[in-house]
Amino acid sequence: MPRKGPAPKRPIVSDPVYGSPLVTALINKVLQRGKRSLAERIVYNALEGCRARTGTDPLITLKRALDNVRPTLEVRSRRVGGATYQVPVEVRPQRSTSLALRWIVHYAKLRREKTMIERLTNELLDASNGLGASVKRREDTHKMAESNRAFAHYRW
């Protein structure tokens, strides 16, 4: 382990259009191969699509979607003796937000709409309404943690 301790976390800068670090984090998750301007265009157009469809502030839609996708429990592998147990642990707030954004972008990419803008718009709207594959992923994660509750005493 380095003597200086862990590297400090860099703060996420707020984006210029909405002034929200969440939008910047979403842009960073959509970003591929350094094409930031393309990622920004996708995210901003998707958020405008949310505004057009719902008539509300897209930041509110994004926050509601994140709240519906954000996991509170997950399982971690822990080796005890010769066996590996799936131990349920609580998810730290920063990790839960990161996981939620990652899942939303991942399942948006798997959708069947023509453009990424449409896919992301629909995934955000579905997630904000408690539907969609990203919400199902959270439910599956919680179900897995609940079914392995017997191993909770192996927590570290």
Curated annotation (Swiss-Prot):
Keywords: Ribonucleoprotein, Ribosomal protein, RNA-binding, rRNA-binding, tRNA-binding. GO terms for cellular component: small ribosomal subunit. GO terms for biological process: translation. Transmembrane segments: none annotated. PROSITE patterns: RIBOSOMAL_S7. InterPro entries: Ribosomal_uS7 (IPR000235), Ribosomal_uS7_bac/org-type (IPR005717), Ribosomal_uS7_CS (IPR020606), Ribosomal_uS7_dom (IPR023798), Ribosomal_uS7_dom_sf (IPR036823). It comes from the Bacteria. One of the primary rRNA binding proteins, it binds directly to 16S rRNA where it nucleates assembly of the head domain of the 30S subunit. Is located at the subunit interface close to the decoding center, probably blocks exit of the E-site tRNA. Part of the 30S ribosomal subunit. Contacts proteins S9 and S11. Belongs to the universal ribosomal protein uS7 family. This is Small ribosomal subunit protein uS7. It comes from Acidothermus cellulolyticus (strain ATCC 43068 / DSM 8971 / 11B). The gene is rpsG.
